[in-house]
């Protein structure tokens, strides 16, 4: 396996100075470096990959056991080895079973919970479940991490399909987040969803208590307007939420992969069970493709291999996700968690130090906004930032097709500009046309040179529908899985989030003066003193 990595790096070193544009002299470049699956068109021809590099990457995937590991995941094997758990978020969108964990078919339970969620969502939507002030007008979803990022992203993405109550998402323990969500809504017609797998997450439970106190000022029985998305029926009950309004999920569903089940209840209420089922169907379609397609034609595998070429082989430590679809403005933040929490590891599955770079820093903003913010660095900065563009061929505003045409033109132009660049000769010609000469021409031309040869991929889809969004999210989930397998890490734990939480719990009594902070470092204690000096804690 080390030999393949060495071959890849040697291949890159030998080819690194060539121009991507020259690769298109081979007539079938676009066909060879693109793939189409169920309405998704993935173009990775604007990269420095060639047949030899792609062949080596595919061999690496085979040698590292992507196919066998994929089969193990779908079979319910406990591939989350550090926690001893199966990884079966895919079961939440599966149409039927059997799917077994520890010899037990989990699908009857999955389908029963899905039906319960759909029934409750429809009751809220049609008014048969009411608040104490009448029909539900607003839903406040309280969660953090996977209990917020996925639902909030998808709810915004599918705004054209909203025909239910208004949705509000609260995640941050910062009181400003809760205060902003509750402004202007009526507690007598508000439903609160508390999303916490353990029902102990400190930020979520703090916000839940605040929401209940807020509601208690105007409502006789606040608990009657609360719903729990949790595996802990007991803790939800202690909070006042009965079992019939508690929707649970099993430990084989990781938080950042949980949107497909009860954690998606808010989205179900917003768009309705039928549209949510289409969302599940899109993801299930991608699951089947990932399971069945040969590696060379497998969209999640190709997405992963391109990413690994850029990160592990070319050494680019960051990846920009650039959706030219304003309703996908939360997708980069969602993918930050999905990719960085999954593959931001330094230890291999066997406990040894990782031999390759782990996952990249993922970030981004929607186009065209980003063009007027950070694209300057992407085009002319000293660091190469591989870019992933996403764009729909068709928008949701038929009266504004000229807007969408301009949006698409900008997206395609950016990918072309990153690859093509502008030479010094071209820049000189531009300055000469403006009447500049001599040293001033040279000086001004230098500022207008674009190095080009900067890689990007484009994911084109017909229109952002529930089905398409399901496909896209599942595509990225499986991409993360493939990258994790090749790196030899566990993509399904997140021990890196624990230490900070433990230290925060210990610091709170220091802030209130109940603990003197013995053993804390001088910097932390000085910051505590500075906060206490201002007051307000």
Curated annotation (Swiss-Prot):
In short, the EC number is: 5.3.1.9
Which is one GO molecular function term here?
A: monosaccharide binding
Top-level enzyme category: isomerase
Q: What is this protein called?
A: Glucose-6-phosphate isomerase
User: Highest taxon of the source?
Assistant: Bacteria
Give the subcellular location: Cytoplasm
Which residues are named in the active-site annotation? 341 (proton donor), 372, 501
An example GO CC term for this entry is: cytosol
Which reaction is this enzyme known to catalyze?
alpha-D-glucose 6-phosphate = beta-D-fructose 6-phosphate
Q: What does this protein do?
A: Catalyzes the reversible isomerization of glucose-6-phosphate to fructose-6-phosphate.
Q: Name one Pfam family in it.
A: PGI
InterPro entries this protein is in? G6P_Isomerase, G6P_Isomerase_C, Phosphoglucose_isomerase_CS, SIS_dom_sf, SIS_PGI_1, SIS_PGI_2
Q: Does the keyword Cytoplasm apply?
A: yes
Mostly located where?
Answer: cytoplasm
Q: Which Gene3D superfamilies does its entry note?
A: 1.10.1390.10, Glucose-6-phosphate isomerase like protein, domain 1 (3.40.50.10490)
The pathway it acts in is: Carbohydrate biosynthesis; gluconeogenesis; Carbohydrate degradation; glycolysis; D-glyceraldehyde 3-phosphate and glycerone phosphate from D-glucose: step 2/4
């Amino acid at each position: 396996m080390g030999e393949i990595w060495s071959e890849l790096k040697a291949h890159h070193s030998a080819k690194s100075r060539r121009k991507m544009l020259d690769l298109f002299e081979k007539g079938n470049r676009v066909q060879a470096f693109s793939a189409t699956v169920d309405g998704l068109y993935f173009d990775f021809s604007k990269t420095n990959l060639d047949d030899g590099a792609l062949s080596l990457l595919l061999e690496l995937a085979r040698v590292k056991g992507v196919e066998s590991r994929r089969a193990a995941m779908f079979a319910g094997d406990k591939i989350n080895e550090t926690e001893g758990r199966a990884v079966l978020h895919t079961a939440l969108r599966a149409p039927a079973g059997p799917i077994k964990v520890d010899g037990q078919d989990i699908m009857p339970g999955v389908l029963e919970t899905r039906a319960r969620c759909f029934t409750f969502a429809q009751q809220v939507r049609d008014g048969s479940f009411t608040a104490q002030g009448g029909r539900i007008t607003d839903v406040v979803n309280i969660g953090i991490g996977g209990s917020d990022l996925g639902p909030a992203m998808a709810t915004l993405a599918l705004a054209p399909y909203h025909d239910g109550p208004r949705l509000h998402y609260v995640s941050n323990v910062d009181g400003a987040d809760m205060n902003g969500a509750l402004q202007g809504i009526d507690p007598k017609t508000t439903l609160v969803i508390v999303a916490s797998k353990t029902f102990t997450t400190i930020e979520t439970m703090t916000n839940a208590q605040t929401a209940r106190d807020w509601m208690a000022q105007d409502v006789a029985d606040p608990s009657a307007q609360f719903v729990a998305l949790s595996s802990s029926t007991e803790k939800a009950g202690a909070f006042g939420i009965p079992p019939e309004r508690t929707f649970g999920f099993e430990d084989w569903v990781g938080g950042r992969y949980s949107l497909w089940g009860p954690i998606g209840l808010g989205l179900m209420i917003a768009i309705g069970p039928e549209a949510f089922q289409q969302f599940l169907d899109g993801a299930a379609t991608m699951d089947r493709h990932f399971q069945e397609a040969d590696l060379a034609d497998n969209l999640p595998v190709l997405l992963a291999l391109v990413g690994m070429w850029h990160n592990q082989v070319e050494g680019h430590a960051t990846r920009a996700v650039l959706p030219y679809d304003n309703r996908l403005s939360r997708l980069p933040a969602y993918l930050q968690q999905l990719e960085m929490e999954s593959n931001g590891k330094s230890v291999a599955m066997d406990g040894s130090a990782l031999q390759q770079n782990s996952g990249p820093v993922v970030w981004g903003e929607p186009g065209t906004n980003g063009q007027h913010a950070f694209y300057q660095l992407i085009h002319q900065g000293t660091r190469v930032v591989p870019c992933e563009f996403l764009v729909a061929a068709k928008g949701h505003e038929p009266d504004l097709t000229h807007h969408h045409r301009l949006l698409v033109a900008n997206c395609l132009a950016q990918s072309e500009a990153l690859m093509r660049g502008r030479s010094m000769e071209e820049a000189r010609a531009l300055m000469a046309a403006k009447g500049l000469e001599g040293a001033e021409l040279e000086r001004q031309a230098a500022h207008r040179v674009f190095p080009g040869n900067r890689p990007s991929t484009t994911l084109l889809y017909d229109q952002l529908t529930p089905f398409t969004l399901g496909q896209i999210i599942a595509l990225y989930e499986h991409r993360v899985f493939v990258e994790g397998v090749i790196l030899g890490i566990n993509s399904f734990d997140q021990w890196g989030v624990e230490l900070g939480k433990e230290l925060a719990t210990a610091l709170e009594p220091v802030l209130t003066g109940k603990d003197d902070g013995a053993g804390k470092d001088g910097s932390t204690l000085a910051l505590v003193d500075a906060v206490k000096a201002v007051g307000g804690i």
